[in-house]
């Protein structure tokens, strides 16, 4: 089972992206492919889920680990498959999705393709109160911690995400990000160690 792919995004289509990893092109279905247009021809880390059914093996991709986590939660719901879960995430308002589930708002859920009243109620029944471990700050389309890091090393991006996973707030991480951009790190660990030094100084 794959956790993520690191490679160059070589193609963006209306339904999927292609990630070239060491000369092998992986077709990855994503919720909103056009979010990846700015990353085309650049090396990126794409979190993935591999779905195997009958004679079909498909990869589904996500911008960050929290989006993938929410996808997996949706798969736990009876009647929700990978394509339905991806269609729900394509709405790009995952904070609203979580709020709707926790507030019994089945009307909000029925606006998604293929989600009727019965399935909406099932989503609420299965997931209400069970999404606290999903980091909603990373699910609002505000990838990379709302920081302008498009010109930075992918190692820097990963280190900032790791600092958030360690429990540091978005404000704390943002405070040191500019200093880290000037640091000549050679790996994610390099940036992570330097980030921890800055946070503890």
Swiss-Prot record:
Briefly, what is this protein's role? Answer: The RuvA-RuvB-RuvC complex processes Holliday junction (HJ) DNA during genetic recombination and DNA repair, while the RuvA-RuvB complex plays an important role in the rescue of blocked DNA replication forks via replication fork reversal (RFR). RuvA specifically binds to HJ cruciform DNA, conferring on it an open structure. The RuvB hexamer acts as an ATP-dependent pump, pulling dsDNA into and through the RuvAB complex. HJ branch migration allows RuvC to scan DNA until it finds its consensus sequence, where it cleaves and resolves the cruciform DNA.
Q: Which CDD domains match?
A: UBA_RuvA_C (cd14332)
Which HAMAP family does the record cross-reference, listed alphabetically? DNA_HJ_migration_RuvA (MF_00031)
Q: What GO terms in the biological process aspect are recorded for it?
A: DNA recombination; DNA repair
UniProt keyword Disulfide bond present: no
Give the start-end ranges of region Domain III. Answer: 151-201
InterPro entries linked to this entry: DNA_helicase_Holl-junc_RuvA_I (IPR013849), Hlx-hairpin-Hlx_DNA-bd_motif (IPR003583), NA-bd_OB-fold (IPR012340), RuvA (IPR000085), RuvA_2-like (IPR010994), RuvA_C (IPR011114), RuvA_C_sf (IPR036267)
Q: Which organism is it from?
A: Ligilactobacillus salivarius (strain UCC118)
Q: Does the keyword DNA repair apply?
A: yes
Q: Name one Pfam family in it.
A: HHH_5
Q: Which SUPFAM superfamilies match?
A: DNA helicase RuvA subunit, C-terminal domain (SSF46929), Nucleic acid-binding proteins (SSF50249), RuvA domain 2-like (SSF47781)
Q: How does it assemble?
A: Homotetramer. Forms an RuvA(8)-RuvB(12)-Holliday junction (HJ) complex. HJ DNA is sandwiched between 2 RuvA tetramers; dsDNA enters through RuvA and exits via RuvB. An RuvB hexamer assembles on each DNA strand where it exits the tetramer. Each RuvB hexamer is contacted by two RuvA subunits (via domain III) on 2 adjacent RuvB subunits; this complex drives branch migration. In the full resolvosome a probable DNA-RuvA(4)-RuvB(12)-RuvC(2) complex forms which resolves the HJ.
Q: Name one GO molecular function term.
A: four-way junction helicase activity
- Residue ranges for the region (Domain I) are 1-63
Cellular component per GO, a single term:
Holliday junction helicase complex
Which keywords annotate this record?
Cytoplasm, DNA damage, DNA recombination, DNA repair, DNA-binding
What's the name of the protein?
Holliday junction branch migration complex subunit RuvA
Q: What is known of its domains?
A: Has three domains with a flexible linker between the domains II and III and assumes an 'L' shape. Domain III is highly mobile and contacts RuvB.
The ranges of region (Domain II) come to 64-142
The record's subcellular location field reads:
Cytoplasm
Q: Where is this region: Flexible linker?
A: 143-150
């Amino acid at each position: 089972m794959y956790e993520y792919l690191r490679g160059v995004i070589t193609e963006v289509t209306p339904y999927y992206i292609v990630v070239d990893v060491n000369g092998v092109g992986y077709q990855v279905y994503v919720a909103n492919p056009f979010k990846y247009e700015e990353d085309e021809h650049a090396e990126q880390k794409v979190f993935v889920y591999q779905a195997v059914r009958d004679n079909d093996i498909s990869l589904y991709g996500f911008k960050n680990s929290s989006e993938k986590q929410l996808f997996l939660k949706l798969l736990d719901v009876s009647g929700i498959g990978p394509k339905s879960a991806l269609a729900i995430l394509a709405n790009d308002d995952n904070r609203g999705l979580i709020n709707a589930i926790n507030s019994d708002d089945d009307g909000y859920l029925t606006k998604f393709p293929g989600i009727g009243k019965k399935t909406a109620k099932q989503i609420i029944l299965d997931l209400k109160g069970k999404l606290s471990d999903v980091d909603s700050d990373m699910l609002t389309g505000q990838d990379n911690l709302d920081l302008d890091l498009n010109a930075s090393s992918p190692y820097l991006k990963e280190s900032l995400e790791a600092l958030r996973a360690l429990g540091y707030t978005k404000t704390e991480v943002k405070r040191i990000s500019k200093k880290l951009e000037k640091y000549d790190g050679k790996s994610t660990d390099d940036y992570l160690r330097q980030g921890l030094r800055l946070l503890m100084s």
